Amino acid sequence: MPIIIDKDLPARKVLQKENIFVMTKERAETQDIRALKIAILNLMPTKQDTEAQLLRLIGNTPLQLDVHLLHMESHLSRNVTQEHLTSFYKTFRDIENEKFDGLIITGAPVETLAFEEVDYWEELKHIMEYSKTNVTSTLHICWGAQAGLYYHYGVPKYPLKEKVFGVFEHEVCEQHVKLLQGFDELFFAPHSRHTEVRENDIRGVKELTLLANSEEAGVHLVIGPEGRQVFALGHSEYSCETLKQEYERDRDKGLNIDVPKNYFKHNNPDEKPLVRWRSHGNLLFSNWLNYYVYQETPYIL
């Protein structure tokens, strides 16, 4: 089934080239189907790349999704045009009286700041509080996961001596959890962050369950009661080239950046990246949508 997006959204052409079924809102209105309402709060500066990455994954399911893109009203985005935001995005004020089946909160390059120092923290707190009563399930990614764990459960983040950067092996910590249906006991996921949350802190909160962990990268997947809140500290949505682009960006700036681990063939940045996380990335998003959104949401929101 398709994802329903604006016919002029640039990501639409990218997805169509990959044979991912997308549908315009105009066509969807002619069908007698109750599509799932999914909001994506896009905190990334590279908004169009993130749009394509997430739409690629949530579009690879049997479910019909009506996607709403959100941006922070209290933050000035410098890497995307105002025209793009005006054409394709809404703010929280635009949707605060609506209910959604699912919400995705992305990462953001602000992890070295204290949460309270982030210029849109107050607005984000309102959105996370809203999600508790107006969203069936919320998936938090990377810094978005750190922010959610901190806001909802008081779990702190800690600075790392070295950036966790690359593709890392993870072990499933809990069997027979719906979010991990079909997962291998060992699987890969990308990480790109300067801070961490710690296993002991997660296990110290009785409402939280640690689902997947990595010896090198640390905590990856955590879930709250009844799956209302899901936290992914890694970046299972990343495309093949994303880590390469981040590495080349920082290298060209003269920053002290290591080659991403377990990513390039033979660890040689002149060779092609080796994708080892795609299948589990698709499985993570499809399980979330199926078991924690579609199976749990009421027909009438």
From Swiss-Prot:
It is an enzyme of class 2 (transferase). GO terms for molecular function: homoserine O-acetyltransferase activity; homoserine O-succinyltransferase activity. Substrate binds at K163, S192, R249. The keyword Nucleotide-binding does not apply. It is found in: Cytoplasm. Signal peptide: none annotated. Its main location: cytoplasm. GO terms for cellular component: cytoplasm. Transmembrane segments: none annotated. Pathway: Amino-acid biosynthesis; L-methionine biosynthesis via de novo pathway; O-acetyl-L-homoserine from L-homoserine: step 1/1. Disulfide bonds: none annotated. Coiled coil: none annotated. Its EC number is 2.3.1.31. The record marks E111 as: Important for acyl-CoA specificity. The active site is at C142, H235, E237. Keywords: Acyltransferase, Amino-acid biosynthesis, Cytoplasm, Methionine biosynthesis, Transferase. InterPro entries: Class_I_gatase-like, HST_MetA, MetA_family. One of its GO terms (biological process) is L-methionine biosynthetic process from homoserine via O-succinyl-L-homoserine and cystathionine. It catalyses: L-homoserine + acetyl-CoA = O-acetyl-L-homoserine + CoA. The record marks S192 as: Important for substrate specificity. Belongs to the MetA family. Transfers an acetyl group from acetyl-CoA to L-homoserine, forming acetyl-L-homoserine. This is Homoserine O-acetyltransferase. It comes from Bacillus cereus (strain B4264). The lineage of its organism: Bacteria, Bacillati, Bacillota, Bacilli, Bacillales.
